[in-house]
Regions:
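An active-site-proximal structural segment forming one wall of the substrate-binding cleft
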Residues: 64-75, 131-134, 164-199, 256-259, ...
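Aromatic- and acidic-residue-enriched carbohydrate-binding clefts of CAZyme catalytic domains
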Residues: 90-126, 155-168, 184-187, 191-206
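Active-site neighborhood of glycoside hydrolase catalytic domains
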Residues: 178, 197-201, 208-251, 256-279
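Conserved small/polar residues in nucleotide/adenosyl-binding loops
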Residues: 280-285
Length: 291
C-alpha cells in the first residue's frame, strides 16, 4: 500500500491449524512506488500469531537472497574483507541475547529473533551462511567475530562460567566447522543442505568484540587453544595486546573511541610498528560535545 492508501498489489490466503506453518505468496506491484508498506490484515475475527515476515524481490543477487541493488553498491566499493556479524551485536546485554552462530543458520523462518544492544529486534535472516556467501560472491575475505563468553563490557558485563562458557566456546568451533568442515561433518551437512556442499573460505577469527582485561584474556586463551587444536590454519585476532601479558597473539584489532584531536595528536602512532606484521584497526572519531 502506498502512503496515501492506494493498493499497489494484493493477495489472500487461508490460515488454519495451530502449528507454526510457512505460507508463501507472490505480489506483483501495478506501478513503482518509493513510499509503500506491507500490510497484513484479517477479514474475520480471531487471533493470528506471526513469527517471521519477509518481503523480497524474486531476483536477488546471484540468487542468494540479498537485494541486488544493495550488493552492487557494496561491490562498487571494491571491499577486500568483511567483519561480521557486527560489533556489540556479538556480545549482547545478557547471556540470552549474546550472539550464537547456531541461531543464524538453517531456514531463515525457523531462526529465533532477538532484541539486541541497540534496542531493535533482528530476525537473523542475514546470518552466518548469508555472510559467507556474500563474501564468496564479492571475493571478500570473511572475518568472523565470535562471542568470547562475556556480554558487553561497555554496559554491565556478565561473565559466562562453567557449562555456559563451554557452550559458547563450542558454538565458535561449530561455526568454523560449518564454514570449512567436510560436508560429511555435522555442521557441514547443514551447510550442504543450504546449497553449499563445498567448504567456504574462512581464514580469520576474531575472538570477542571490543573486550579487554583479565576476564577477557582468560576466555581468549581458552578459545585460542581450542581453535588451534582443531583448526591450526585459522588466524586469530585479539581485541587488545594480549601478548603483553604472555598470551599468544597473531593479530590485534585495536579499537579507538575518541575525539578527532586524539587522532591528530597520534599521527605517528604506527611509525615504529613492525612493517611485516598484520595490522588491523577500528577507529571511530567522535566529538564528545556532539555525540
Amino acid at each position: 500500500i502506498e502512503y496515501q492508501g492506494k493498493v499497489l498489489a494484493g493477495n489472500s490466503l487461508v490460515v488454519s491449524g495451530q502449528e507454526y506453518t510457512r505460507y508463501d505468496m507472490k505480489l506483483t506491484a501495478a506501478e513503482d512506488c518509493h513510499e509503500a508498506q506491507l500490510t497484513i490484515s484479517c477479514k474475520e475475527g480471531g487471533e493470528v500469531l506471526l513469527g517471521f515476515i519477509s518481503l523480497m524481490p524474486d531476483n536477488t543477487y546471484m540468487g542468494h537472497g540479498l537485494r541486488t541493488d544493495l550488493v552492487e553498491k557494496l561491490k562498487g566499493m571494491s571491499p577486500k574483507f568483511m567483519r561480521f556479524p557486527g560489533g556489540c551485536i556479538v556480545e549482547g546485554t545478557t547471556p540470552s541475547t549474546a550472539m550464537r552462530f547456531r541461531d543464524t543458520v538453517g531456514p531463515a523462518w525457523e531462526r529465533p529473533s532477538k532484541l539486541f544492544v541497540w534496542h531493535y529486534r533482528s530476525t537473523l535472516g542475514l546470518g552466518f551462511h548469508e555472510y559467507l556467501q556474500l563474501c564468496e560472491d564479492l571475493g571478500m575475505e570473511p572475518l568472523y567475530v565470535c562471542n568470547c563468553g562475556m556480554t558487553c563490557q561497555g554496559r554491565k558485563s556478565v561473565l559466562l562460567e562453567g557449562e555456559a562458557l563451554d557452550e559458547m566456546v563450542q558454538d565458535t568451533l561449530d561455526a568454523i566447522e560449518y564454514a570449512i568442515g567436510s560436508k560429511e561433518s555435522k555442521w557441514g551437512r547443514l551447510r550442504a543442505s543450504m546449497g553449499h556442499p563445498e567448504p567456504f573460505k574462512m581464514t580469520y577469527l576474531e575472538i570477542g568484540n571490543e573486550n579487554w582485561g583479565p576476564d577477557y584474556e582468560k576466555r581468549y586463551n581458552m578459545i585460542y587453544k581450542k581453535v588451534k587444536e582443531l583448526y591450526p590454519q585459522i588466524k586469530t585476532i585479539a581485541n587488545e595486546h594480549v601478548e603483553k601479558n604472555g598470551c599468544p597473539a597473531e593479530c590485534v584489532d585495536e579499537h579507538f573511541y575518541n575525539t578527532t584531536e586524539f587522532f591528530a595528536e597520534r599521527v605517528n602512532y604506527y611509525d615504529d610498528y613492525d612493517r611485516n606484521c598484520l595490522l588491523y584497526t577500528s577507529p571511530s572519531p567522535r566529538d564528545p560535545k556532539t555525540s
